[in-house]
C-alpha cells in the first residue's frame, strides 16, 4: 500500500477509511429486496418522469414518501429502505462501537501494514 512508507516512518497518526458494500454481496434475497423497492418507487413516479414539465421536487417528495411507507416485508433484509439510500452501518454490531465489517477492515489494514495496533 502507498501509505506503508509513511506509517513505517511514524508520519501517520490516524487513517480513516470508508467502504461501500453492494446489496448483491448479501445474495439473491438482498438483490430481490433492492429491485422490489426500486420498482415500487418507479411505479409511484413514472407518470411524472414522463412529463418534462413536472417539478423535480414533487417527484422527490413522492420518492421519499414511498420509502417511508415501505412495509416490513419490503425491508426484511436491511430493515431500512435500501433503494435510493446509503446505509451507514452494515453487518453485525460488535457492541464495542464497531460493526463487524469495520473491525475486519481494521484488522486487514493492520495485517497488511505489519502493525500490531
Which residue ranges define each predicted feature?
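Active-site-lining helix/loop region of Rossmann-like oxidoreductase modules
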Residues: 1-117
Amino acid at each position: 500500500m502507498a501509505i506503508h512508507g509513511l506509517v513505517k516512518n511514524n508520519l501517520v497518526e490516524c487513517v480513516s477509511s470508508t467502504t461501500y458494500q453492494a446489496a448483491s454481496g448479501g445474495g439473491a434475497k438482498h438483490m430481490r429486496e433492492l429491485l422490489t423497492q426500486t420498482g415500487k418507487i418507479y411505479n409511484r413516479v413514472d407518470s411524472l418522469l414522463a412529463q418534462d414539465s413536472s417539478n423535480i421536487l414533487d417527484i422527490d417528495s413522492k420518492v421519499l414518501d414511498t420509502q417511508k411507507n415501505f412495509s416490513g416485508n419490503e425491508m426484511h433484509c436491511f430493515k431500512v429502505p435500501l433503494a435510493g439510500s446509503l446505509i451507514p452501518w452494515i453487518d453485525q454490531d460488535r457492541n464495542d462501537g464497531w460493526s463487524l465489517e469495520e473491525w475486519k477492515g481494521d484488522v486487514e489494514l493492520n495485517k497488511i501494514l505489519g502493525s500490531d495496533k
